[in-house]
Amino acid sequence: MKTRPAMSDDAEGMAAVQNEIFAAGLRKTPTDKTTILAAYIDPEDRIQCVVAEGDDGRILGFQSLRLAKVGNPWDVAEGWGIIGTHVSPLAARRGVGSALFRDTLRAAREFGLRSIDASIGADNMLGQAYYEAMGFQTYRTPDGLVCKAFYL
């Protein structure tokens, strides 16, 4: 497995990861290549998006880091980072999330972030456990979410 920056050519493989998560009942909606491009590869607030790629070239997971701006949909404080992690259930427990976070943490430090938010569904126990294992701490619980912070 290797990690590298996400590129436009990865959108289809990234959509496949999210759709595998959906098929496993761990995501509320399926997605497509167009949505991936807009939300993860080409957004104006992107700091970094990194993919984990298997030895066969298949995308195993990806992680995005965005800069929180005023009025963002997660109500994260302006200037914070906003992280999102997506790992295929077929690649679970193989160190994919840890490898992705190492790259994301490096990018956050280089960008000068002081805090990163992970807004996780209150019913997403796997996501909450992952972020806790990475060192995030719960700092607020708006309706239906558990928001965890990582302080750099």
Located regions from the model:
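A short beta-loop-alpha structural element at the N-terminal edge
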Residues: K2-A16, R27, R140
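Acetyl-CoA-dependent GNAT
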Residues: S8, I21-L90, Y139
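Short alpha-helical
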Residues: D9-G13, I59, M125-L126
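Alpha-helical elements of Rossmann-like donor-binding domains used by nucleotide-donor carbohydrate transfer enzymes
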Residues: G13-V17, T35, A99, D103
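Residues within well-ordered alpha-helical secondary structure of globular protein domains
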Residues: V17-E20, A133
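C-terminal "cap" of GNAT-fold acetyltransferases
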Residues: E78-G81, D117, G121-Q128, E132-L152
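Conserved acetyl-CoA-binding loop-helix of GNAT-fold acetyltransferases
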Residues: G84-V87, R93-R106, A129-A133
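Conserved GNAT acetyl-CoA-binding A-motif
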Residues: A108-I120
